[in-house]
Amino acid sequence: MKVAFVMGSDSDLPVVEKGIKTVQDFGVEVVVRVISAHRTPGAAEEFAKTAEENGIGVIVAAAGKAAHLGGVLAAYTTIPVIGLPIKSSTLDGLDSLLSIVQMPPGIPVATVAIDGAENAGILAVQMLALGNAELKEKLKVHKKAMADKVAAKDAAVAARFC
């Protein structure tokens, strides 16, 4: 299964690339597209309707400002959609966050923090890992590596003051 990263504008790419790299680090294939919910709604509908048959298991929808992309995609598919609010000059991304998180009943969009591309990638991998023991093991290794880093930093700081 693949993870699709769909962004409303190519200006979102510097943020989205962090999520793409995260997913690729787990050995998961990605599909990356620029589709606007407002300027190319037909393309958004077509992408969402054909995502599953194209091997996509999770969609990460990145958008700023009005940020309707995730909701539009979720309306046309049954696969999970993760909304990634992008910080824009307007309201520092709060407008994006609220646009994504306030979905009507029956059309959920999981939402991560503003510019939280790495967590969007991790969440997408966790969703795929529900049916994939190899991915689940990679996630366990990843979490242990994070814990080991914190333990090393803890030891270094403690050693400075003991």
Where are the model-predicted features located?
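N-terminal beta-loop-helix "entrance" segment that forms/cooperates
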Residues: 32-53
